[in-house]
A protein has these predicted regions:
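Short active-site oxyanion
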Residues: 5, 109-114, 158-159
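Acidic/glycine-enriched edge-of-secondary-structure segments
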Residues: 6-10, 47-56, 220-237
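Active-site beta->alpha loop and helix N-cap motifs at the rims of alpha/beta catalytic domains
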Residues: 10-31, 38-129, 133-148
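Alpha-helix-loop-beta-strand connector modules within alpha/beta enzyme cores
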Residues: 63-76, 179-184, 188, 279-285
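Hydrophobic packing residues within well-ordered alpha-helices of enzyme cores
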Residues: 125, 151, 173-176, 276, ...
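Catalytic alpha/beta core domains of metabolic enzymes, predominantly
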Residues: 133-252, 257-269
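C-terminal helical cap(s) of enzyme catalytic domains, especially alpha/beta-barrels
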Residues: 267-285
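Single conserved hydrophobic/aromatic residue that forms the stacking wall/gate
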Residues: 287-299
Length: 299
């Protein structure tokens, strides 16, 4: 794997199918509009009503067969976000989640994966769907560097997404071995308050909602009521900019970068695609979304 290439892992596999249906041909046919040092490593997500789901509650859906066909056409790995941390044995027989895994396991090139939190689910997936690679979810909130190292040493995982508050621990990160660095996948654009003490509880609440429960949890972080604003996220101490990727992380030997946004609108996700992948001279004039058709057009 070329260490000078940034592999982006993008949000909204099901949620933003129409956006990617228009964007991916553009990315292939007009590659000169985009940075030559990056590509798309995967697109992740899950349809609504998946009890194995976690991280975010999915609201948008699209036919799984069409989703997979699109990504296979462009040689991009698809990832199911099955990071529910509250699963018990009886949940493992869920028909919808198993059918999705079976469908995703059919692809051999590129292989598809599953983002996972639960150890119970991890062992189940290894046993029943060994064709799928596994990613350790950021919902584990790995803020301790030694815990991150141990996670990267596990053969179970191809990638590990640490908590965003380890993003700027440069000295510690640089002590990782090459094989450990190959597994680290940084979450670049997290909006969560850097000093949040309830991040794990927040993710657990999402897991419970996906199981049909109504957890008693509300975010009390400063500015939470404002919603997601990319301009504000850029000021977060854990934010990883395009310049950071080029000048710091790639030279250090890190290649994988996750962009969050499953619970956001397609316009915001498009903004991320422009910022992280598109050359500045094209960012304002190259692509825009025409509502309500959501067509990606060249202007």
């Amino acid at each position: 794997m070329n260490k000078q290439t940034a592999h982006y892992h993008l949000p909204g596999l099901f949620e933003f199918y129409e956006l990617y249906r228009m964007f991916l041909p553009l990315f292939r046919e007009h590659r000169e509009y985009f940075y030559d040092w990056c590509d798309i490593g995967s697109i992740y997500g899950a349809p609504p009503d998946c009890i194995w789901g976690g991280g975010r509650v999915s609201l948008e859906d699209h036919d799984a067969g069409e989703v997979l066909a699109l990504l296979q056409e462009y040689g991009i790995s698809a990832r199911l976000t099955f990071s529910n941390s509250k699963l018990i044995e009886e949940h493992l027989s869920d028909r919808k989640c198993n059918e999705l895994c079976a469908l995703f396991a059919e692809n051999t090139e590129p292989k598809n994966g599953v983002i996972v939190h639960s150890e119970l689910l991890l062992q189940y997936l290894k046993s029943h769907y060994p064709q799928l690679y596994l990613i350790s979810s950021t919902t584990k909130v790995l803020t301790d560097f030694e815990a991150l190292k141990k996670e990267t040493d596990r053969e179970d995982f191809r990638y590990v997404v640490p908590d965003f508050r380890l993003n700027k621990a440069y000295e510690k990160l640089n002590t990782l071995t090459e094989s450990q660095k190959d597994k680290v996948e940084f979450l670049c654009n997290e909006c969560c308050y850097f000093g949040c003490k309830d991040r794990k509880e927040c993710y657990e609440a999402v897991s419970r909602r996906n199981l049909g429960e109504e957890p008693d949890f509300s975010c009390t972080s400063p500015g939470a009521e404002e919603g997601y604003r990319f301009s504000k996220v850029m000021k977060n101490p854990g934010f990883i900019s395009v310049g950071d990727i080029q000048k710091i992380y790639l030279p250090m030997g890190f290649s994988n970068y996750k962009i969050e946004g499953r619970g956001l609108g397609s316009a915001l996700v498009l903004e991320f695609l422009l910022y992280y992948m598109t050359k500045p001279e094209y960012q304002l004039s190259l692509i825009h979304i025409s509502e309500p058709t959501r067509r990606v057009v060249i202007s």
